[in-house]
Amino acid sequence: MMDEMEQKICALVDARKDEIIAFAQDLWTHAELGFQEHRSAGKFAGIMKGLGLRTEEGLAVTGVKSYLKNSSDGPTICLMGELDGLPIPNHAYANPETGAAHCCGHNAQMAGVMGAALALSDPEVAAALHGNVVFFGVPAEEYVEIEKRNEMRRQGLIRYGCGKCELLRIGALDDVDIVVGHHASCEKKYLVANRSCNGFITKLYRFEGRSANAAGAPQDGIDAMSAANIAMHAVDVQRETFRDQDTVRVHGCLTKGGGAANIIADDVRMEYSIRGKTIEAYLDAARKVDRSMRAGAVATGCGLTITTLPGNLPIVPVKDATVVEDALKLVCGDTPVTWTGPEFHSTSSGDYGDISCQMPLLQFNTGGFRGHLHSADVELADPYDAYVVPAKVFALIAYKLLKGTADRARAIMESFEAVLTREQYLGSDGEHAHQRAHGLTAPAAPEGHHLCGLMSLLAVLFKRPHHPKSREICKERSRRHRSPSSVGLYRSTSIKRWFVRHNDLLNPRSEGTSK
């Protein structure tokens, strides 16, 4: 049963449902990609300012943070929605210029946060909250356009590839005690999402060969595409080495694959996401993928550059998420509330993982869509379920956490054990913390590591062409280490001594790689 204030909150949301739906549909038809959500952020900020809320803009490029109260003695609850879409250009409402589409339902999250703000900013409701509420539109949850984001990193515009990681880095969440997040569903459901999720790391691979006439003089070339083919097959044969309990996922794509069929490819590039249940699991898998890429380079005589980018940390469940269940039960009607608790693990990843390592994270799922998320067939099924229901749930969770003396919020905060403090996450310099959290130690530049020294040696021994810039490139390498496991692979005494001295070429320490 709802108490009087809960009834008022739901009535306030229902009274503004047309505005909530209109806002959501506006975002639906004008999706933007991560760190580029200027229009969406501007729309959200305008509504928050219209409610008289103090609002900060441009956080982590496009983030928007609004405060219900200017100060408070109680806990601060952050209701968080994600601004960005996915690059799915064949979706019916994809942005014709960028291909962005809201195929993950982030527009529903933003509608939920916006609708909750409409209700909680009512003076009577706000007075009943012993604490503060932050309404946050965050950028770049989807880890896409990796090359573009890497360029933004080089320019100093961002340091991490996802928005929440950037917000943590710049201190925009320092005053937040509990974060509440929402996920859209293509089923009619009311779900308490208190599960763990995989973390991941991202790899960029570049094979550098030599172009030649593929018909007239293929022997003069070094085929970077062949190197990539060998590497991808080598990755596939690694899969049987991944332990089931580590829930490892390795998936990638070619981002550049040569320019013409009759020209030996001299520049082939790939992106890989490497996921696992624990940091140790996905770092182990990443080493195996790196090893597979080196195998392709060794076999063909190509140069190889490996760039390692931090992804997201695994999501850590809270000990008590019953407040989410209680809020869902008030709006679910005859549909039962379901749970995915700590015993359930998802192989997906998200930048909520980084948040969950430092502060309590409460999450819920609601429906209103049909089709398949992250697919071109996702479409709106029920505007009320998709947009208005999340607003009620967001607002009810905030109220339940902060009603009275905010006992439920304080209990969650007291039972939470941080995996990383802010200081541990950021480190003493605040620059390479995320890399350290992922077991990565090297700074962001210079990029990559190279096998060209090894290629030069093999070229001398076997009279094969080698990368023309091998000596120059190898001078750029910033770190080397030894891996005893590689030494025993080579039995020829004449070559073995060279490999013993230079086996770091087989297992080099690349940008951001520690092992």
Identify the residue ranges that each predicted region occupies.
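Histidine/acidic-residue-rich, glycine-tolerant segments that coordinate divalent metal ions
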Residues: 91-101, 107-108, 123-251, 258-263
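Acidic/His- and Gly-rich active-site-bordering loop/insert found
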Residues: 2-103, 107-134, 139
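Divalent metal-coordination and catalytic microenvironments
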Residues: 27, 79, 106, 135, ...
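Metal-dependent amide/peptide-bond hydrolase catalytic core
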Residues: 2-4, 226-452
